[in-house]
């Protein structure tokens, strides 16, 4: 990024607090260090979470999803997250090997509040743990084991502002190009032929249907 002349960049937390203000009374008290019944119930009903990891090159945020409860609460301070088949780039897993700090954001469709869980992640192929994460008779090859350092519920303001679950505000699916077309244009810098786009879209669709587990 090229910093434009005359743009003020905050470089210390004192400046941040001066503009943003102090945390609201009581908000820091909600941070706890282990699972209890409400966080367990939320995770058991969540079919989707975002996984944040980092490396020396930067940060990654990756979606994770399956049937509600796909993330397993092993005990009060440990979560197991299955590594389902993907594109095998394995950015998140590579990051975890080198930088164990990770964050999770759990969502439940229709609810505007979320659950944030932070801690240290480790990769494991321990068979008893993998069996706990089996789905559709398929056992994952790997799992992420999260050692929890803090967790807390996050307020619903972002979801209220965005109207994420309000179907009347959802855009038509064809308002954007297909995934295949967008990827090809990013790679080649120009629109693909219809034949190539159709072939890529078909391959992506088949992969999404046949290689979920």
Model regions and ranges:
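Binding-site signature for planar aromatic cofactors or substrates
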Residues: 1-213
């Amino acid at each position: 990024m090229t910093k434009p002349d005359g743009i003020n960049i905050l470089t210390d937390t004192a400046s941040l607090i001066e503009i943003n203000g102090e945390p609201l009374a009581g908000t820091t008290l909600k941070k706890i260090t282990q699972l209890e019944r409400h966080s367990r119930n939320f995770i058991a009903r969540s079919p989707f979470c975002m996984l944040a990891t980092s490396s020396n090159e930067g940060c990654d945020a990756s979606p994770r999803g399956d049937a509600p409860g796909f993330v397993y609460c092993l005990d009060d301070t440990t979560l197991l997250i299955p590594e389902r088949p993907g594109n095998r780039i394995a950015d998140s897993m590579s990051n975890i090997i080198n930088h164990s700090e990770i964050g999770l954001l759990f969502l439940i469709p229709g609810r505007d509040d979320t659950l944030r869980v932070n801690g240290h992640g480790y990769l494991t192929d321990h068979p008893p743990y993998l069996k706990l994460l089996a789905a559709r008779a398929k056992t994952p090859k790997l799992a992420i084991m999260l050692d929890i350092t803090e967790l807390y519920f996050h307020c619903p303001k972002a979801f209220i502002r965005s109207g994420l679950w309000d179907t009347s505000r959802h855009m038509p699916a064809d308002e954007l190009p297909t995934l295949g077309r967008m990827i090809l244009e990013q790679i080649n810098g120009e629109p693909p032929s219809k034949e190539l786009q159709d072939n890529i879209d078909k391959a992506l669709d088949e992969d999404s249907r046949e290689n979920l587990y």
